[in-house]
């Protein structure tokens, strides 16, 4: 059976690999010159299932108002003329309640934990190397209020069976020795020992080679025009003016997914969250992070690769603008300079931006559609790397008619129809 996958980021490439293992004939098409050239190119590098949380959380609307007045705010909104932007923000606000947050976080943790297990299995089976570290993630709290507010997340971690440690200042210094010199700036931390790090682009490129060895064909530099349908079936995809036909189709185009789906009558509530990163050469390994640090105040991640530090964060709701904002670089430099002042050479840092495909509830869209041969694997937001292997494995099982190892409930696009019905009946807008 022939499958055409649109998109060669980490999600599309992993999907291709797992489908090829199931015996499918797979073709991957992308407009770029190689895999992982857009959102997967220079992300924060963290594989952090336990920290999988929706931006749409209780209290976020009030925080967003305060953030608008702050120079180094983690979230910024740049109004555009697009109705999609306002529609998406309204949907996000409807999810900012305790009931929705609990449901959405459970779904995100479910797919993320499974994804980490799939990544472990894949690494053991293939020996793929991507500067991986299995040393956990440490979320830093600068105030006691942040420590106290972590209680709701800890409750969900307990419910999901995710191991964690609450650290005081001494514990922080033990877990991340380079932070000993700045311990007085910190009130505590939440550490998840099973989290990992790794270079997403390196992983994707190497996995693409492994997929090719399984027979996957990658076609780069192609313009994907539109999907053609006939009744409840996708009959082909127009690529560079030519109709390409397959038995099944997978759309993994990230933030650009809605553009392809809207003409088909599928409303995918995905909007780009613009993020930034710095890649910094390490000058003193003893003064650099050991694994991944999350600064709760600035929502910035600092990740250790072999000889580099990757600093990533920010979320701009600004449409498809890919210009580099110097103020965002200032924020990233502020955070890494504050916590690891002697770890790397900021004068040699590389500044990058990418668009994360975010859903209003934070959960990716993985699974079937109203078209019998069209499947989606998109909308992973800031956690595409974390969720990629689990999403790809889940999708491959569904397409092969196998029972997945985790529940797929609430992960496909039909949940938004249920959410709309719940809202119309006056119930909380949880994507049930």
UniProtKB/Swiss-Prot annotation:
It is an enzyme of class 1 (oxidoreductase). Keywords: FAD, Flavoprotein, Oxidoreductase. FAD binds at residues 3-17. Its EC number is 1.4.99.-. Its cofactor is FAD. It catalyses: a D-alpha-amino acid + A + H2O = a 2-oxocarboxylate + AH2 + NH4(+). SUPFAM superfamilies: FAD-linked reductases, C-terminal domain, FAD/NAD(P)-binding domain. Pfam families: DAO. The keyword Calcium does not apply. It comes from the Bacteria. One of its GO terms (biological process) is D-alanine catabolic process. GO terms for molecular function: D-amino-acid dehydrogenase activity. The keyword Transcription regulation does not apply. InterPro entries: DadA, FAD-dep_OxRdtase, FAD/NAD-bd_sf. One of its GO terms (cellular component) is cytoplasm. Belongs to the DadA oxidoreductase family. Oxidative deamination of D-amino acids. This is D-amino acid dehydrogenase 1. It comes from Pseudomonas putida (strain ATCC 47054 / DSM 6125 / CFBP 8728 / NCIMB 11950 / KT2440).
């Amino acid at each position: 059976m022939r499958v055409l996958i649109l998109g060669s980021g980490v999600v599309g490439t992993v999907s291709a690999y797992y489908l090829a293992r199931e015996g499918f004939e797979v073709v991957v098409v992308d407009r770029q010159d190689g895999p992982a050239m857009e959102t997967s190119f220079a992300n924060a590098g963290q594989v952090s299932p336990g920290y999988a949380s929706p931006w749409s959380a209780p209290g976020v609307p009030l925080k967003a108002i305060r953030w608008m007045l702050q120079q180094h705010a983690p979230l910024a909104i740049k109004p555009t003329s697009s109705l999609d932007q306002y529609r998406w923000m309204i949907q996000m606000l409807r999810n900012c309640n305790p009931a929705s947050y609990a449901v959405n976080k459970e779904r995100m943790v479910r797919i993320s934990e499974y994804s980490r297990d799939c990544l472990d299995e894949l690494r053991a089976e293939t020996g793929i190397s991507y500067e991986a570290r299995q040393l956990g993630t440490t979320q830093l709290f600068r105030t006691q209020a942040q420590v106290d507010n972590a209680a709701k997340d800890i409750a969900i971690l307990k419910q999901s069976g995710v191991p964690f440690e609450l650290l005081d200042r001494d514990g922080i210094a033990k877990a991340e020795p380079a932070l000993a010199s700045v311990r007085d700036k910190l009130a505590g931390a939440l550490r998840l020992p099973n989290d990992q790090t790794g270079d997403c682009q390196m992983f994707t490129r190497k996995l693409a080679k492994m997929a090719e060895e399984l027979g996957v064909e990658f076609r780069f530099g192609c313009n994907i025009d539109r999907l053609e349908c006939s009744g409840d079936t996708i009959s082909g995809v127009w690529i560079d003016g030519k109709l390409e036909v397959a038995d099944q189709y997978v759309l993994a185009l990230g933030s650009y997914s809605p553009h392809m789906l809207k003409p088909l009558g599928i409303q995918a509530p995905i909007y780009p969250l613009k993020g930034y990163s710095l890649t910094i050469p390490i000058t003193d390994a003893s003064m650099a992070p050991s694994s991944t640090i999350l600064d709760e105040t600035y929502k910035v991640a600092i990740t250790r690769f072999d000889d580099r530090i990757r600093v990533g964060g920010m979320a701009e709701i600004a449409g498809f603008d890919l210009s580099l904002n110097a103020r965002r670089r200032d924020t990233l430099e502020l955070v890494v300079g504050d916590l690891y002042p002697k770890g790397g050479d900021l004068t040699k840092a590389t500044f990058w931006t990418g668009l994360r495909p975010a859903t209003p509830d934070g959960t990716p869209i993985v699974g079937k559609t109203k078209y019998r041969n069209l499947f989606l694997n998109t909308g992973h937001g800031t956690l595409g790397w974390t969720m990629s292997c689990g999403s790809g494995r889940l999708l491959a099982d569904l397409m092969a008619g196998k029972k997945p190892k985790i529940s797929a409930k609430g992960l496909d696009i039909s949940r938004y129809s249920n959410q709309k019905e719940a809202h119309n009946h006056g119930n909380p807008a949880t994507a049930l």
